[in-house]
Amino acid sequence: MLPRVNKRSNCIAKKTSNRLISAVSLAIASLCISQSALADGMPKTNTFWWPEQLNLQPLRQNDAKSNPLGGDFNYADAFKTLNLANVKSDIKALLTSSQDWWPADYGHYGPFFVRMAWHSTGTYRMSDGRGGGAGGQQRFEPLNSWPDNVSLDKARRLLWPIKQKYGRSLSWADLMVLTGNVAMESMGFTIYGFAGGREDDFEPDLVYWGPEKKWLGGNERYSGERKLEEPLAAVQMGLIYVNPEGPNGNHDPISAAADIRDVFARMAMNDEETVALIAGGHTFGKAHGAHKPDECLDPAPAGATIEEQGLGWKNKCGKGNAEDTITSGLEGAWSVSPTQWTMQYLDNLFGFEWVETQSPAGATQWIPKDNAGANLVPDAHVKSKRHAPIMFTTDLALKEDPQYRKIAERFHANPKEFELAFSKAWFKLTHRDMGPRARYVGDESPTDDFLWQDPIPSVDYSLIDKRDIQHLKTKLLDGDVTPAQLVKTAWAAAASFRATDMRGGVNGARIQLAPQKNWEVNNPDELNTVLMFLNKVKKDFNDGQSGNKQVSLADLIVLGGAAAIEHAASKNDFDVEVPFIPGRSDATQAQTEVESFAVLEPKADGFRNYYAQGNTLSPVEMLVDKANTLDLSVPEMSVLVAGLRVMNINADGSDRGVLTDNPGTLNNDFFVNLLDMSTRWEKAKDQQDLYLGIDRKSNKQRWSASSVDLIFGSNSELRAVAEVYASDDAHQQFVDDFVNAWTKVMTLDRFDL
């Protein structure tokens, strides 16, 4: 979902009902936008004056101009030059090299770096694929200043010497995950594997993190019986997952379990993976709440003074670190050996009866009843001190919720099963947003095909050549389906891709499988007709081969679209060849997790003039969101909409936005007729999002259109692009740019190219 423009400043709340929340909120209060920043000498954005104006910025983020590595830099190739064993050795040495400016708990930074890696990747949400570790976004606002990320600025500074040593060959995004892995290995845990390949961003992502205008505030993201707004996957603004003290700090493990189940499911984790992650993660390290944050902490990094050089939460109480550290406001360790992989978390969870207590910061946590185990846990810095183990309200949820308890008890009784479950869940957590295995780089990646990776069979046959391609194009165009249907099918398959988490796309031909074949936007009956035809072409060709040569349905889908576009261009006297590279494969239903793929179903697709009921964003905002997930620029989005309109591929088969007298001909008629001043536009009275184009002289209807169509004449930036393509000298450019943008979408999932 697109980020929303707040009409008021994002001020931090100074009071909430929860003491922990209040304390942390005050500690980051300087994140409140200063009104003086909008005053003298500062330019005001257009959205300041016109808040409802369409925001095209998502299509311009992470521009090549902001990347100091340059557009030709290939990170995967650079990563391959690393001696990963040497990198891991350097990280391992760092883990026990405690620094005076930020001393390591128990003399070992391992748990600290596990938290860093978890919080880097743990922002991922399945609904729209946003968040996650890709890009190293934890370095930037707002994530670097989220209340849940207190002190992680120090973790990244501790890693700087290693990042500095390996430079561009090791991204921050990869380094944070790799360090978490090495940390756990150094503490005796067996990691399932690691894959590199996460490129760094150099600016913050534009992500909708929630409607709130204050950190950790309120239930604005909830409706009804605690229904969390889509696409969000955290209970409050500024948290990775859930409030450790329970919903709104209510200290109730049962309601906390409901929050945990909802939120973890939204990041694609089932109950078993959830229990494994919580129990495994809390085996390591401790929480920090030595003092009240509102009395001790300076602002977060985004609001800190310039001399702090990007660090935040400066602590003016006691030593300012070590035994005086303040992070969550909760205080203590879950186990006796916080820097070793043990079963002590589950031992303690089930071995003690737990009662509420208050941390020194005033947060509610739990300790064993009747002072049992009061001296079990060594202090992280003061050798003469010992403490009782602690649990969060969310920890006790694993004991009190019947389903979680059953899993936790099984893990407790079967340590090897627990270790394997945590290992696999950790690998999934840290790699979920990378997409298919084809994107993995390095020799430490497991060879398993997990369903969550959307596996696609490898090509084990000879690919079609140029002569075959021409033969198949003829077969496709001479068949029982129309060129428009071929284009529509190719777009439906390829446009399921999400650049946010590299899922979807035409490769795998999953458009013939559940759930995609049944999506409303794909017009299932028509789609089935086209797929039957394409599968017959595939069978006839493959049966006619004497050798090992074959063509996949996925390749035929793309080739059909290419042939149809070439045909449409030829009707306008343009001889074009749409680039086509075979090599796609076809997945099976057994390789396709229906529930997981269901989240890819478009709620809107402006390229097909489709808009479902229940969207919170307008059709034009959803168009930009769709273009963003397809990694399109403003001109690419514009030329694709215009070209697909004249190709007549609307999802419902209507002529809405088909601004041409020659449907099926690839030309710039859409822009020419949209900008034609002999037409005036008025809103239809009886239909939603329908506009009528009326001839100014005859007063007769000439066209119909949606808001998605009209935005290219209404929005000043889009109109500027439309004017280029509508000009008399732009006919060839329009066709060329359309073909280039089309080819880009068709190959978004070709990670092998």
Swiss-Prot record:
Keywords: Heme, Hydrogen peroxide, Iron, Metal-binding, Oxidoreductase, Peroxidase, Signal. One of its GO terms (biological process) is cellular response to hydrogen peroxide. Its EC number is 1.11.1.21. It catalyses: H2O2 + AH2 = A + 2 H2O; 2 H2O2 = O2 + 2 H2O. SUPFAM superfamilies: Heme-dependent peroxidases. The record marks R115 as: Transition state stabilizer. Its cofactor is heme b. There is a cross-link at Y241-M267 (Tryptophyl-tyrosyl-methioninium (Tyr-Met) (with W-118)). One of its GO terms (cellular component) is cytosol. Formation of the three residue Trp-Tyr-Met cross-link is important for the catalase, but not the peroxidase activity of the enzyme. Heme b binds at H282. The active site is at H119. Homodimer or homotetramer. Belongs to the peroxidase family. Peroxidase/catalase subfamily. Bifunctional enzyme with both catalase and broad-spectrum peroxidase activity. This is Catalase-peroxidase. The gene is katG.
